[in-house]
Amino acid sequence: MSMADQLQIPADIKPRDGRFGCGPSKVRPEQLQALSTTAAPLFGTSHRQAPVKNLVGRLRSGLAELFSLPDGYQVILGNGGATAFWDAAAFGLIDKRSLHLSYGEFSSKFAAAVAKNPFVGDPVVIKSDAGSAPEPQSDPSVDLIAWAHNETSTGVAVPVRRPADSGDALVAIDATSGAGGLPVDIGETDAYYFSPQKNFAGDGGLWLALMSPAALARVESIAASGRWVPDFLSLPIAVENSLKDQTYNTPAIGTLALMAEQVDWMLGNGGLDWAVKRTADSAGRLYSWAEERDYTTPFVADPKLRSQVVGTIDLVDDVDAAAVAKILRANGVVDTEPYRKLGRNQLRVGMFPAVDPDDVSALTQCVDWVVERL
């Protein structure tokens, strides 16, 4: 019998819900219940008809309220997830050249996608080591500036502020794991894009972008230039359909319904301010615990860059983080493993709004209990 099978964490210290993944993340039971009640009649029906279009409209209006969209901004959506949006943006938002801040797996991937696109110039890439981040900056040669609000692989959060002297350059923010859990002024961005499976406790396969009038105008001007783009990645097609409360091709009803329920739940509890306070509460508990123990250290050294939705905690060399995560998993406390490519002796904890801060405290107690017995 393995150590993971032998160690049974006492029930009275375990979290009520043991899901701490950084995406897919915890889905609340009430969301799942809605799939079999209010959303049930929509399954197996046309996405071009009123019932499904009303669901899309409910989601779009909910996001507009949650993020207090400035005048002229629109909620645009399409199938494929944020990964597809990188290519869509390379085709449809970059006129000639872009600048990218690269400080982890996901912030680097948009730059890599742009570098492969034959219609735009080589991107300017400003890099920093994992666990840190470059300062957002402008460059006179670029017409789009991109970075990640929250780098999911490392737990680094970079505030969203339009760089000085950026001129007409669009600001595109990958908010895949930041939207809905971190503070943001959407007016500081032109394309704030994300997916449902992080803060919005849904399934993947969908991208959403909060787009400014300048971004929408860029989409139109690039389309008018005659640049070729696959229809699936066409932002003009996505905009046209989104304004009709639909998607270009068939969406997953469950994904839309789960996310709409989560957005309504956030709004009902106080909106984005409430969600941000909740994730900050969870993060405060995790980082204070990590700083108090002699076997743990927050991976992100600068407290100002530490994410309040994805916490990365290094363990000392003589405590095997993989063994700790394995024992936690055997006890129903799951998805605390680090990002696979980071290669650190580390635990990674998702602290999205669906996660109860008390469960984060319980997780830390479980880690202490396990480490004492290794």
UniProtKB/Swiss-Prot annotation:
Disulfide bonds, paired cysteine numbers: none
Pathway named in the protein's UniProt entry: Amino-acid biosynthesis; L-serine biosynthesis; L-serine from 3-phospho-D-glycerate: step 2/3; Cofactor biosynthesis; pyridoxine 5'-phosphate biosynthesis; pyridoxine 5'-phosphate from D-erythrose 4-phosphate: step 3/5
GO cellular component terms given for this protein: cytoplasm
InterPro entries: Aminotrans_V_dom (IPR000192), Pser_aminoTfrase (IPR022278), Pser_aminoTfrase_mycobac (IPR006272), PyrdxlP-dep_Trfase (IPR015424), PyrdxlP-dep_Trfase_major (IPR015421), PyrdxlP-dep_Trfase_small (IPR015422)
Superkingdom assignment: Bacteria
Subunit relationships: Homodimer.
Record protein name field: Putative phosphoserine aminotransferase
Native source organism of the sequence: Mycobacterium avium (strain 104)
Lineage: Bacteria, Bacillati, Actinomycetota, Actinomycetes, Mycobacteriales
